[in-house]
Amino acid sequence: MLNLTKDKRKSLGSFYTPDSLADKMVRKFKSLEGNFVDFTAGDGSLLRALNRAGVDWSRLYANELDKSSYENLLKMNPDLPRDHVLNMDALDDECHKKMLEITGGQYQVILNPPFSKANKIVSKILEFMPE
């Protein structure tokens, strides 16, 4: 898990998803086919849960806004292709346009967004999510 101070996590609204919860979230998917995106990836716990469930790293994509969290995400998930990871604001249209581009326009979303921005982030994802 990240070595961020409690104050830093609070300022980011960041509380990383425990493995047990991540695994439960993954089990709720009807299908594990296709690509998966976590727009608020943190340390990548949801991506690792998908991988544990059999989803190949080549079908996993991530975005993380905070630079130190982004760098830690890359370190903690060495099998995640680097060109599948963005360091952008999930509330920015450009983040979603870039994700559509790198995924080929097809993906399912898994995320546990910062509580303080959850509604805005989910609304933005729905605006750009492929049908």
Model-found features: residue ranges?
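Class I S-adenosyl-L-methionine-dependent methyltransferase catalytic core
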Residues: 1-131
